[in-house]
């Protein structure tokens, strides 16, 4: 089964992707990992991508699609794969389909923006240990202090509300059109159209996991 997991940053895709990968015995595939592996292995595609990146350019979609084809032909993808952070744009989704790469199921994790802002802007981190807290969901015993050392907790720049809002804006402009694209594709009934399922990404991690796994098994 080949799966694409869609959702805004902070929707919980990373956590659920691990569960899906384990449940179905399929690898997570990210374009970043693919590019690094191809460059390291010095494959023709990897060398072409490296030349573009070394010149400060963006790797074009046709090269990314070729890398995807190369990757999914490997033995660990025999039972499928889970695409992680790809496709990001409508052009990539269309190129994926034009390239004859069949996708079986699209899962959209739907979480309102204000919930994502609350989740992300409430995170606090103890830098030395990496211990993570949340001011609402997992607060430290003493506000803004690490439970074990008493040292100060910090809010990472990525978690500041202004940054989160910018990332959500970019998601809505670039990636959200994929939701409509795949939903319409699913509804038009063409033979190669993937199934499309929207999951509410609110609830416990276990509840969301169970719903996603049941949906994929359905």
From Swiss-Prot:
<protein>
    <recommendedName>
        <fullName>Adenylate kinase</fullName>
        <ecNumber>2.7.4.3</ecNumber>
    </recommendedName>
</protein>
<feature type="binding site">
    <location>
        <position position="156"/>
    </location>
    <ligand>
        <name>AMP</name>
    </ligand>
</feature>
<dbReference type="Pfam" id="PF05191">
    <property type="entry name" value="ADK_lid"/>
</dbReference>
<dbReference type="InterPro" id="IPR000850">
    <property type="entry name" value="Adenylat/UMP-CMP_kin"/>
</dbReference>
<feature type="binding site">
    <location>
        <begin position="10"/>
        <end position="15"/>
    </location>
    <ligand>
        <name>ATP</name>
    </ligand>
</feature>
<keyword id="KW-0963">Cytoplasm</keyword>
<keyword id="KW-0545">Nucleotide biosynthesis</keyword>
<dbReference type="GO" id="GO:0004017">
    <property type="term" value="F:adenylate kinase activity"/>
</dbReference>
<dbReference type="Pfam" id="PF00406">
    <property type="entry name" value="ADK"/>
</dbReference>
<comment type="pathway">
    <text>Purine metabolism; AMP biosynthesis via salvage pathway; AMP from ADP: step 1/1.</text>
</comment>
<comment type="subunit">
    <text>Monomer.</text>
</comment>
<dbReference type="InterPro" id="IPR006259">
    <property type="entry name" value="Adenyl_kin_sub"/>
</dbReference>
<dbReference type="GO" id="GO:0005524">
    <property type="term" value="F:ATP binding"/>
</dbReference>
<feature type="binding site">
    <location>
        <position position="92"/>
    </location>
    <ligand>
        <name>AMP</name>
    </ligand>
</feature>
<feature type="binding site">
    <location>
        <position position="123"/>
    </location>
    <ligand>
        <name>ATP</name>
    </ligand>
</feature>
<dbReference type="GO" id="GO:0005737">
    <property type="term" value="C:cytoplasm"/>
</dbReference>
<feature type="region of interest" description="LID">
    <location>
        <begin position="122"/>
        <end position="159"/>
    </location>
</feature>
<dbReference type="InterPro" id="IPR033690">
    <property type="entry name" value="Adenylat_kinase_CS"/>
</dbReference>
<feature type="binding site">
    <location>
        <position position="36"/>
    </location>
    <ligand>
        <name>AMP</name>
    </ligand>
</feature>
<keyword id="KW-0808">Transferase</keyword>
<feature type="binding site">
    <location>
        <begin position="57"/>
        <end position="59"/>
    </location>
    <ligand>
        <name>AMP</name>
    </ligand>
</feature>
<feature type="binding site">
    <location>
        <position position="167"/>
    </location>
    <ligand>
        <name>AMP</name>
    </ligand>
</feature>
<keyword id="KW-0067">ATP-binding</keyword>
<dbReference type="GO" id="GO:0044209">
    <property type="term" value="P:AMP salvage"/>
</dbReference>
<feature type="binding site">
    <location>
        <begin position="132"/>
        <end position="133"/>
    </location>
    <ligand>
        <name>ATP</name>
    </ligand>
</feature>
<feature type="binding site">
    <location>
        <position position="203"/>
    </location>
    <ligand>
        <name>ATP</name>
    </ligand>
</feature>
<dbReference type="InterPro" id="IPR007862">
    <property type="entry name" value="Adenylate_kinase_lid-dom"/>
</dbReference>
<keyword id="KW-0418">Kinase</keyword>
<comment type="similarity">
    <text>Belongs to the adenylate kinase family.</text>
</comment>
<feature type="region of interest" description="NMP">
    <location>
        <begin position="30"/>
        <end position="59"/>
    </location>
</feature>
<keyword id="KW-0547">Nucleotide-binding</keyword>
<feature type="binding site">
    <location>
        <position position="31"/>
    </location>
    <ligand>
        <name>AMP</name>
    </ligand>
</feature>
<comment type="function">
    <text>Catalyzes the reversible transfer of the terminal phosphate group between ATP and AMP. Plays an important role in cellular energy homeostasis and in adenine nucleotide metabolism.</text>
</comment>
<dbReference type="InterPro" id="IPR027417">
    <property type="entry name" value="P-loop_NTPase"/>
</dbReference>
<feature type="binding site">
    <location>
        <begin position="85"/>
        <end position="88"/>
    </location>
    <ligand>
        <name>AMP</name>
    </ligand>
</feature>
